[in-house]
Design a protein with these regions (language model features):
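Short, contiguous, pocket-lining structural segments
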Residues: 1, 18, 45
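Acidic donor-binding loop at a coil-to-helix junction in glycosyltransferase catalytic cores
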Residues: 1-8
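Amphipathic alpha-helical repeat scaffolds of TPR domains
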Residues: 67-79
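A structural signal for short, well-ordered beta-strand segments and their strand-loop junctions
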Residues: 17-19, 64-65
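Catalytic core of nucleotide-sugar-dependent glycosyltransferases
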Residues: 21-30, 36-61, 72, 82-103
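Carbohydrate-recognition loop of C-type lectin domains
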Residues: 13
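Membrane-interface aromatic/basic loop that binds lipid-linked glycans or pyrophosphate carriers
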Residues: 82-144
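Active-site anion-handling motifs in enzyme catalytic cores
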Residues: 55, 71-74, 117-118, 143
Length: 144
């Protein structure tokens, strides 16, 4: 993942230069990881990457690393909420448990995300119901 590679590169760099230039020209092709079938890599790789960065970063970045981990847990849970319920139930429950294990860090989140995290941990049925409704009404039936 690009994020992990950038973290390692910048961690080892003695200096860096900012250039306002984007060399990437992403083209999403049929069958790419973005549009392909959902699998365990799609679910757990972003979480693993954030956890690796959190474990490797210094104290001055711990809070930012924790926020990044919490946000990706919220995002992945939301994605699993709109996917096939039966197929991803165990994964959704596992992500919920990972989020619940980080409960003491919820105070780092924005008010909105703190509310979402609490709903996922304390009333997941309510989150799933309201989130699916939100996706149907305001996102045209798709969330990504």
């Amino acid at each position: 993942e690009d994020i992990l590679m950038n973290f390692y590169l910048f961690s080892e760099a003695k200096q860096s230069v900012y250039e306002d230039f984007c060399p990437y020209r992403y083209i999403i092709r049929k069958g790419s990881a973005v549009t392909g079938r959902k699998n365990t890599h799609w679910i757990y790789d972003p979480i693993r990457v954030r956890q690796l960065i959190l474990d490797a970063c210094g104290e001055e970045l711990k809070e930012d690393g924790e926020i990044a981990l919490l946000r990706v847990l919220l995002y992945v849970y939301a994605l699993l909420t709109v996917e096939d319920r039966k197929k991803f139930r165990a994964d959704r429950d596992k992500v919920q448990a990972l989020l619940a294990a980080e409960r003491e860090s919820f105070s780092l989140l924005t008010r909105r995300n703190r509310l979402l995290a609490g709903a996922i941990c304390d009333a997941p049925w309510l989150f799933r119901l309201t989130f699916r409704l939100y996706v149907r009404l305001f996102r045209g039936g798709e969330y990504a």
